[in-house]
Amino acid sequence: MRTPRAFTLVELLVVIGIIGLLIGILLPTLSRARAASNRTACAAQLRDIGHAFTMYMNDSRNKLPRVNTMPSMVPPPADNPPSAVQVLQPYIKGATNVWRCPADIIRKPSPGSPAGFDTYFDREGLSYQYNPMLSSSNAGMPLEKTDYYQRYHSLQLVVIFYDYEPFHGKAGKPGSTNYLFADSHVGDME
């Protein structure tokens, strides 16, 4: 009588090793794909914010909004202007998720948070920073009259919003931060 043929221990270990090797190759690729997906989602959301900003500018005779760039700041400024979310949300029909970048998972120490850490979105209500060069002294002015615009003379070079943190890579590296420009395109700083 012949015994049924079975896999030997060596054959099973070889198969397990090959599967482990394939997983080792695929996981970094999947991680890069997820990061690229998050960057694209953030860029699309910034583009939506850019369209809302353009609609606001059209309604306000091309004058820049007065916004508080850090609403969580304590104490608030004396006049305490509204946040960018409060100013632009009426122009973003029903979508509230545009204010949070899916890659905004960087946690910073925060004494007010029960856990001790929170994201920029948790503190400020958005993952993007309104360009401080356009707020305060330039608020209420037409964009083209600001010193910031006069430096570049092009809507394609004037940054309106940007990722608060380098969500998409190491700081200073190309592709680590999305920037929304005044012409509503989203890109990287060259």
Which sequence ranges carry the predicted segments?
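Amphipathic alpha-helical segments typified by the pilin-like N-terminal helix
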Residues: 2-44
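Short, well-structured segments within or immediately adjacent to enzyme catalytic domains
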Residues: 40-190
